[in-house]
Amino acid sequence: MIDLSTIAAQLNARTILPEGIVVITLLVVLVGDLILGRSSTKWTPYAAIVGLLGAIVALYTQWDSSNTIGFLGAFNADALSIAFRGIIAISAITTILMSVAYIEQTGTPLGEFICILLTATLGAMFLSGADELVMIFISLETLSISSYLLTGYTKRDPRSNEAALKYLLIGAASSAIFLYGISLLYGLSGGETRLTAIASSMANAGSANISLALVIALVFAIAGISFKISAVPFHQWTPDVYEGSPTPVVAFLSVGSKAAGFALAIRLLVTAFPLVSEQWHFVFTALAILSMVLGNVVALAQTSMKRLLAYSSIGQAGFVMIGLLANTEAGYASMIFYLLVYLFMNLGGFTCVILFSLRTGTDQISEYAGLYQKDPLLTLGLSLCLLSLGGIPPLAGFFGKIYLFWAGWQAGLYWLVLLGLITSVASIYYYIRVVKMMVVKEPQEMSDVIKNYPPISWKLPGMRPLQVGLILSVLATSLAGILSNPLFTLANSSIAKTPMLNSALVKTVEANSVASQLDFSLPSKN
């Protein structure tokens, strides 16, 4: 006889309550849009925001839960996943606020856009807690396919179609590479799919052949993850996709998708690859160096705000990798804190870009010349967000970088931290270049677009949500610096409450000693 209570205990469906709320919200928006048509745009954005806020409340109720394993080990609702899922949900809320006016102007259905965005959010949230290979791949593909659809959503725009095609082709290749890597893990572990079981199985085997194959699996898995976080040299899609995609979509990809990628990186590398810890540290060190240097250097030559922010996001990914490479409690906590403040300063910057493009139809940096004289509030908001991205005190970005660099320095990553400081200083130049251009005082230096700058009416449909999103982002960017200590304490608490990371930090030395005894060379032919 089937014991339903045992099955219910093993499934532990409460672990995915936040995702369940997002699914219900998605269905409400979808059905409402089908029944009411265009008139549903008056309430669908707010219904989606309420649902996402409900998901955040559900995440809060799970904070101190000790029963975090659900669905036979496929999902882990530990504090680490709660932190990342919260960041993803907040990024989705902000994206919805900034997208209403933009999507309405393009003439495409808003309800469908929100449904696809909620699906991408759902995939990213599941990916943050996925603890099993099948769950990881399904979540990753849910996020990826939704992202492709969002990228090409404004189908009347040829740039959007081109961006979607490039993203689809490169993303499909990346997914195939990642799938090959995790299929190797499945074979090496003797058919295990849970990450902890895979690590235990390979630790018990420990032969030279398994070690070589494990490194190959590691390389393929890192390639797939690097595509998702836009790490060099897997970044080629980023500038073109960011430039051609709808700006709210770019904002979500730069934060929500990237946060999910880093959550996957932590869980997969720490849990499944402890025997090759030195190898993945070496690979990510190279990725961090390339991302920080190329991202911040190439950004200096950009003439489009969206391309500038694209290369900026590549450089920011390099900074976040320092926390991953530190492999300490402070390192992982600094990653979470930086992604949280990066959410607000980056989305705030994109909100300002949307406001400017709605009124001028351009995102060229040269057209921002003299903006202060016509729109001082927009100039102030964009300046604060850009200066925070550059790490200027006392804004949130400064404290985020301080925590990352300090964690890296304590872990002995001296040259990497010094390179991070140098490239961070270089990034300040291209951020301040935009700020300086906006505050020119001479009338003859103003761009033609600014000379004919139209007045804004906040009473137009979708403008109020955009205004709220901008105010919240700018305030958070400004105040998060003052509140950095309690926010970092919260991030540190999420690491301390995660058994996976605690055990990994304790066993790092043991794993390295075991790995040093393994032979990674190819067998010689007799």
Curated annotation (Swiss-Prot):
Keyword field: Membrane, NAD, NADP, Plastoquinone, Quinone, Thylakoid, Translocase, Transmembrane, Transmembrane helix, Transport
Source organism superkingdom: Bacteria
Assigned EC number: 7.1.1.-
Topology class, membrane: Multi-pass membrane protein
Gene Ontology biological-process entries: ATP synthesis coupled electron transport; photosynthesis, light reaction
Recorded family membership: Belongs to the complex I subunit 2 family.
Role played: NDH-1 shuttles electrons from an unknown electron donor, via FMN and iron-sulfur (Fe-S) centers, to quinones in the respiratory and/or the photosynthetic chain. The immediate electron acceptor for the enzyme in this species is believed to be plastoquinone. Couples the redox reaction to proton translocation, and thus conserves the redox energy in a proton gradient. Cyanobacterial NDH-1 also plays a role in inorganic carbon-concentration.
SUBUNIT field: NDH-1 can be composed of about 15 different subunits; different subcomplexes with different compositions have been identified which probably have different functions.
Name used for this protein in its record: NAD(P)H-quinone oxidoreductase subunit 2
